């Protein structure tokens, strides 16, 4: 399996890129979120990859972050979602937006993605609901969430009796580097205004 590519970016034409790794050019399909963060052609680039072998093709998908690749892998496990659909979802939604939609069980964001209908969106929400940790809806279960303070604030709000939707909305407004006590204080102030 090819897990990572490091080399010179030779071509980039959405959604494909070519990376020269010591004289060998690897063609990768990337989500638009990764594509927009790529350097100019001729510069060094590192992509985390997922190698997929099919009967008629061998395909390489590249990602700018481990979280994005992990989400792609989870999407592939959903019945009826292939690599093309998973890439379209990650091109249309950030990982955070997808996690938020799953946490709140909202099909609205998913059906805006080309190729994702109402039934597929509902299946995605059903099959992914246990795959995302409740830390503001931003991390996959089993990954190491960087926002433990947000998770603690969210858990505190839930323990105080706020529903998940209100608590998630309040936590999403907090700065990323906030302390837990300050986060709870600001969230309670925000929730008391509604």
UniProtKB/Swiss-Prot annotation:
GO terms for cellular component: cytoplasm; Holliday junction helicase complex; Holliday junction resolvase complex. Pfam families: HHH_5, RuvA_C, RuvA_N. Residues 141-144 are annotated as: Flexible linker. It comes from the Bacteria. Gene3D superfamilies: 5' to 3' exonuclease, C-terminal subdomain, DNA helicase RuvA subunit, C-terminal domain, Nucleic acid-binding proteins. SUPFAM superfamilies: DNA helicase RuvA subunit, C-terminal domain (SSF46929), Nucleic acid-binding proteins (SSF50249), RuvA domain 2-like (SSF47781). InterPro entries: DNA_helicase_Holl-junc_RuvA_I, Hlx-hairpin-Hlx_DNA-bd_motif, NA-bd_OB-fold, RuvA, RuvA_2-like, RuvA_C, RuvA_C_sf. It is found in: Cytoplasm. One of its GO terms (molecular function) is four-way junction DNA binding. Residues 145-194 are annotated as: Domain III. Residues 1-64 are annotated as: Domain I. Residues 65-141 are annotated as: Domain II. GO terms for biological process: DNA recombination; DNA repair. Its main location: cytoplasm. Keywords: Cytoplasm, DNA damage, DNA recombination, DNA repair, DNA-binding. Belongs to the RuvA family. Homotetramer. Forms an RuvA(8)-RuvB(12)-Holliday junction (HJ) complex. HJ DNA is sandwiched between 2 RuvA tetramers; dsDNA enters through RuvA and exits via RuvB. An RuvB hexamer assembles on each DNA strand where it exits the tetramer. Each RuvB hexamer is contacted by two RuvA subunits (via domain III) on 2 adjacent RuvB subunits; this complex drives branch migration. In the full resolvosome a probable DNA-RuvA(4)-RuvB(12)-RuvC(2) complex forms which resolves the HJ. The RuvA-RuvB-RuvC complex processes Holliday junction (HJ) DNA during genetic recombination and DNA repair, while the RuvA-RuvB complex plays an important role in the rescue of blocked DNA replication forks via replication fork reversal (RFR). RuvA specifically binds to HJ cruciform DNA, conferring on it an open structure. The RuvB hexamer acts as an ATP-dependent pump, pulling dsDNA into and through the RuvAB complex. HJ branch migration allows RuvC to scan DNA until it finds its consensus sequence, where it cleaves and resolves the cruciform DNA. Has three domains with a flexible linker between the domains II and III and assumes an 'L' shape. Domain III is highly mobile and contacts RuvB. This is Holliday junction branch migration complex subunit RuvA. The gene is ruvA.
